[in-house]
Amino acid sequence: MIKLIRGFRDILPGQVELWQDIESKARVLLENFGFREIRLPIMESTELFARGIGADTDIVEKEMYTFPDSKGRGQTLRPEATASVVRSYIEHGYAGSDPVQKFYTIGPMFRHERPQKGRYRQFYQINAEMFGVASPLADVQIMYMLHLFFTGLDVPDVVTHVNSLGCPECRPKFREALISFVSDKMDRLCSDCQRRADANPLRVIDCKVPGCKEAVQGAPSIQDHLCPDCKEHFEAVIKGLDGLNVPYEIDPRLVRGLDYYTRTTFEVQTTLLGAQNAVAGGGRYDGLVKILGGKETPAIGFAVGFDRLAALLGAEEKDFTVPPALFIAALGDEARKIAFGWLCDFNARGVRAEMDYEGKSLKSQMKQANRFNAGRVLILGENELQNGMAVLRNMDTKEQEEVALDGLTDRVAALINQG
């Protein structure tokens, strides 16, 4: 038997309904805030992610699924969506013609990392990206949307952790202070952090290796190195969150795992998923459009971890299954032929209906209707054909009535729609 590849999974009926509910609520919220859906390919040029995410990040160095094409050019299954959205934004001329845009996308991402609770090699994200707005009000709105989203889903114990990573003007001073801090702790750092310490010391702060996390305790805070403009921007963000009553914590150690972030960065965290405690995250990436070949354009966005969110909500064992309103029990070939026509008619009208296709006994078919938890059963056999009347049984009240075969689907559909 061929089995699933490690780190991948099937999302089965009973689970899918929860995912559909989350997705539906996300679409409504995003579109209420003016975001429009964009659908993107799952494979892009490897260069897009190397330039966009950062060549020194764990994602690019270790986690990407990359394949050569027939000419030896690298192609990569997307490990995140933002770089792809930016590529599309530039390629289709938005940056030049109408730079203020809001997009969202929902779909699978791929990273070759160690599978664990809430983490898979194919995982799903809800992504929202806003281009062309430099105001801190955009940052506030993005985090407020996430607050509304998780509140609307009744997700417990969530709080937004927020930080500022500064800009190209103030980050070099912080970088120097950080390099100086880690220089005498190199022997306590993992091999990756030792290699990255000079070129990209922020990655040392972001490292999840316990020894590295311990070594950087007491490291300089970016908050102490912000330039006046970045400090003013961050203060405006905090004031905006206060004004909208969004729960937050200022977290000077929050740097995220992507190099494109500038100024505001944030994570929505919960205590209910163990070590994998972030269910959403994002931030500002004002330089990314230019890095990828477009004009300098302010931008901000977020990604929601669909798998972790579904695991969190699924723990409450909500039942999203919608049972059929009608089960048709047919006895005999002629009755089954007529019943199949009714079934198709009901389904076309939007009535959720099922039937037995195999010619089982009435007793077996009634058991099947119970397993489906059908609201009503329509019975058609030889006697009903002779009398010109089918039997309609209410499975809750056990009451039953006869319904004329002529015009039956009209009358039964009307009864079901009445409740």
From Swiss-Prot:
Could you tell me the EC number(s) of this protein?
Answer: 6.1.1.21
The main location class comes to: cytoplasm
Family, according to the entry, reads as follows:
Belongs to the class-II aminoacyl-tRNA synthetase family.
One molecular function GO term is: ATP binding
Q: How does it assemble?
A: Homodimer.
Q: Is this entry keyworded Zinc-finger?
A: no
Task: Give me the Gene Ontology terms describing cellular component.
Answer: cytoplasm
Cell compartments where the protein resides: Cytoplasm
The Gene Ontology biological process terms listed for this entry are:
histidyl-tRNA aminoacylation
Q: Catalysed reaction per UniProt?
A: tRNA(His) + L-histidine + ATP = L-histidyl-tRNA(His) + AMP + diphosphate + H(+)
Q: State the InterPro entries in the record.
A: aa-tRNA-synth_II, aa-tRNA-synth_II/BPL/LPL, Anticodon-bd, Anticodon-bd_dom_sf, His-tRNA-ligase, HisRS-like_core, HisRS/HisZ, HisRS_anticodon
> Which Pfam families does the record associate with it?
HGTP_anticodon, tRNA-synt_His
The protein's name in its UniProt record: Histidine--tRNA ligase
Entry keyword set: Aminoacyl-tRNA synthetase, ATP-binding, Cytoplasm, Ligase, Nucleotide-binding, Protein biosynthesis
Query: What gene is behind this protein?
Result: hisS
